[in-house]
């Protein structure tokens, strides 16, 4: 199982939100590129980036910060937030991102996801952000009647590289991931599932890994708070 350290970008800074609330942002640093380099130095295999302003605006906002990160990295990175058309997808992939994450458009324009997955094989993931099993869009500000499992299954034949499943109520809360819901999603599809939201300890990571079905886990606040040591976590997952 791959551990993805997270860098969430708001106004060019590294932040973490609590349950997706922009006004509940905690700033952890003003040099995202330096933070990315530190994660890479600790041995991470991938990095998970989110343009929080972009998720609400519907277009990239923290582009300069993302480009600065990419200039420092040698490991692959994936980005979500405000990526809602083919032009933006192509632009980010050309700039060096390994993978883009499509969330809102996966609900509103699933044909775009399929088109992108065909055009860029292995480089398009779907972000499924859910509250009590129902998908939320537009930076989690809009709740839908779409069930997370139904959305995941609808892309089974689309060729997407991964599904990133976020339990919104756990995100940033340091309350542990929703292992049951994430594992259920992983059982429901053949697409690799990456868990996000609530990972707060080494025990959480081990529990996710031990399902035998979850391909990856994203952690942010626990790494910044020191509750999770990245080097130790990576050693444990590779053992």
UniProtKB/Swiss-Prot annotation:
Q: Which molecular function terms from Gene Ontology are attached?
A: 1-(5-phosphoribosyl)-5-[(5-phosphoribosylamino)methylideneamino]imidazole-4-carboxamide isomerase activity
Q: Tell me the InterPro entries matching this sequence.
A: Aldolase_TIM, His_biosynth, HisA_bact_arch, Isoase_HisA-like, Isoase_HisA-like_bact, RibuloseP-bd_barrel
Question: How is this protein annotated for GO cellular component?
Answer: cytoplasm
What this protein catalyses is: 1-(5-phospho-beta-D-ribosyl)-5-[(5-phospho-beta-D-ribosylamino)methylideneamino]imidazole-4-carboxamide = 5-[(5-phospho-1-deoxy-D-ribulos-1-ylimino)methylamino]-1-(5-phospho-beta-D-ribosyl)imidazole-4-carboxamide
Subcellular location(s) of the protein: Cytoplasm
Involved pathway(s): Amino-acid biosynthesis; L-histidine biosynthesis; L-histidine from 5-phospho-alpha-D-ribose 1-diphosphate: step 4/9
List the residue ranges forming a coiled coil, or say none: none
Pfam entry (one):
His_biosynth
Which keywords appear in this protein's UniProt record, sorted alphabetically?
Amino-acid biosynthesis, Cytoplasm, Histidine biosynthesis, Isomerase
Q: Which residues form the active site?
A: 8 (proton acceptor), 129 (proton donor)
Its EC number(s)? 5.3.1.16
Q: Which Gene3D superfamilies match?
A: Aldolase class I (3.20.20.70)
Indicate yes or no for the key word Cytoplasm.
Answer: yes
Answer yes or no on keyword Cytoplasm: yes
CDD domains on file: HisA
| Biological process according to GO | L-histidine biosynthetic process; L-tryptophan biosynthetic process
PANTHER family cross-referenced by the UniProt entry: 1-(5-PHOSPHORIBOSYL)-5-[(5-PHOSPHORIBOSYLAMINO)METHYLIDENEAMINO] IMIDAZOLE-4-CARBOXAMIDE ISOMERASE
Protein family: Belongs to the HisA/HisF family.
Protein name, per record: 1-(5-phosphoribosyl)-5-[(5-phosphoribosylamino)methylideneamino] imidazole-4-carboxamide isomerase
Give the species this sequence originates from: Cereibacter sphaeroides (strain ATCC 17025 / ATH 2.4.3) (Rhodobacter sphaeroides)
Q: Which gene encodes it?
A: hisA
């Amino acid at each position: 199982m791959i551990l993805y350290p997270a860098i969430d970008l708001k106004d060019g800074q590294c932040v973490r939100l609590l349950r997706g609330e922009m006004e509940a942002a905690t700033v952890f640093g003003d040099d995202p590129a330096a933070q990315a380099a530190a994660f890479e130095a600790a041995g991470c295999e991938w990095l998970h980036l989110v343009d929080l302003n972009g998720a609400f605006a519907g277009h990239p906002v923290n582009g300069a910060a993302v480009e600065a990160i990419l200039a420092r990295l040698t490991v692959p990175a994936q980005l979500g937030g405000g990526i809602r058309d083919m032009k933006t997808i192509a632009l980010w992939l050309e700039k060096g991102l390994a993978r883009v994450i499509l969330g809102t458009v996966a609900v509103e324009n699933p044909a775009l996801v399929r088109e992108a997955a065909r055009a860029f094989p292995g480089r398009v993931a779907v972000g499924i952000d859910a509250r009590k099993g129902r998908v939320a869009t537009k930076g989690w500000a809009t709740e839908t009647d779409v069930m997370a499992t139904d959305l995941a299954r609808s892309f089974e034949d689309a060729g997407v590289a991964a599904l990133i499943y976020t339990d919104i109520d756990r995100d940033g809360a340091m309350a542990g991931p929703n292992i049951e819901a994430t594992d259920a999603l992983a059982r429901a599809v053949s697409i690799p599932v990456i868990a996000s939201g609530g990972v707060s300890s080494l025990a959480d990571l081990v529990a996710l890994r031990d399902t035998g079905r979850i391909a990856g886990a994203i952690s942010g606040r626990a790494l910044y708070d020191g509750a999770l040591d990245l080097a130790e976590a990576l050693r444990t997952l590779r053992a």
